[in-house]
């Protein structure tokens, strides 16, 4: 099987490149020139990005199958028992919680990775990477817990304030309705 070849040259000073149609790769006549290394790196990046985008799309469809139970479990006729709406809402809640947990994990991993790199630059090389990783993860967990605690304190304080305001409004409402109903009947009656 003979492959058709085409020779490309961009200028007279650069080495010629050969495109082999069977493999769709550029092959340089001088294998270790700067242009050939640059082209190889560029095509590798292009191939990696194409491969990663196709794997992402495959993962997306696989995760959809996991959430929806595969293609063979779809019901054509709706259920008559009346519980299907509740089940769908419960599945929706579970999937949204699952997505939230996945998002938080990915954010934690990204922040942890950046923090580990920054701390390794600052700390001496004698410290083990496992110790640095443990310390960074612990500090990030404690920080996220303290932020969560502060957020919950704010929510609880707002809830307590709203509850107190509602009680005061009900107290004033009850007092106003009492005075409207009975008037001044509980005090001394003036002589007519």
Curated annotation (Swiss-Prot):
Gene deleted: what happens? Answer: Short hypocotyl in dark with drastic reduction in apical hook curvature. Enhanced inhibition in hypocotyl elongation in white light (WL), especially at lower fluence rates. Delayed flowering under long-day conditions. Reduced lateral roots formation. Reduced chlorophyll accumulation and expression of light-regulated genes. Increase in the anthocyanin level in the dark. Reduced sensitivity to abscisic acid (ABA) leading to impaired ABA-mediated reduction of seed germination. The double mutant shw1 phyB exhibits a strongly reduced hypocotyl length in WL.
Listed transmembrane segments: 122-142, 159-179
Q: Where is this motif: Nuclear localization signal?
A: 43-50
**Where does this polypeptide localize?**
Nucleus membrane
Q: In which tissues is it expressed?
A: Expressed in young seedlings (e.g. hypocotyl and cotyledons) and in green tissues (e.g. leaves, stems, sepals, and young siliques).
Membrane topology for this entry? Multi-pass membrane protein
The source's superkingdom equals: Eukaryota
InterPro entries recorded: SHW1
Function field: Negative regulator of photomorphogenesis modulating both light and abscisic acid (ABA) signaling pathways. Negatively regulates the light-mediated inhibition of hypocotyl elongation, probably in a PHYB-mediated signaling pathway, but promotes flowering time (especially in long days) and lateral root formation. Enhances light-regulated gene expression. Promotes COP1-mediated degradation of HY5 during seedling development (e.g. hypocotyl growth) through enhanced ubiquitination in the darkness. Also involved in root gravitropism.
**Quaternary arrangement and interactors, per the entry?**
Interacts with HY5 and COP1 in the nucleus.
Protein name per Swiss-Prot or TrEMBL: Protein SHORT HYPOCOTYL IN WHITE LIGHT 1
- The species is Arabidopsis thaliana (Mouse-ear cress)
